[in-house]
């Protein structure tokens, strides 16, 4: 049974109904409609914690989707799943692909920074100070990019940049 017929959540049902109306009203081509259906089902499965099903849907959407901006969001969501599963290197690959297609995606930039920061903390705990500092510097660069795009977001990152002396831009604060 397609995921669109299994939504138990009111918000998911509402989103699905609205998406179906948009698909019927707006003149998309068949391929774009199919890609959107897979993307929508992927988001629904991801929200339900059904990561394998979500990935299957996202990969199908990627095969069909031609629009670079839409592809960036699909790649971003795939990155989220891999990150949630502790597959940080794989998540980084997808986030980097997403920002190659859409450099104005602050959430992907933030997630890259979060992974580098996490890896920096791990390196620090294991006594690899030079590696730790290099990873923290990478995290800082990605957080700065994310904050430039969304200055009212990422307050904790802004504070971390300030406290660690990695912020050259007072405009954040």
Curated annotation (Swiss-Prot):
Subcellular location, record wording: Cellular thylakoid membrane
Name of the protein in question: Photosystem I assembly protein Ycf3
Top-rank taxon: Bacteria
Keyword Membrane among record annotations: yes
InterPro entries: PSI_Ycf3_assembly (IPR022818), TPR-like_helical_dom_sf (IPR011990), TPR_rpt (IPR019734), Ycf3/AcsC/BcsC/TPR_MFPF (IPR051685)
HAMAP family named in the record: Ycf3
Gene from which the chain derives: ycf3
Annotated PANTHER family: CELLULOSE SYNTHASE OPERON PROTEIN C, TPR REPEAT-CONTAINING PROTEIN MJ0263
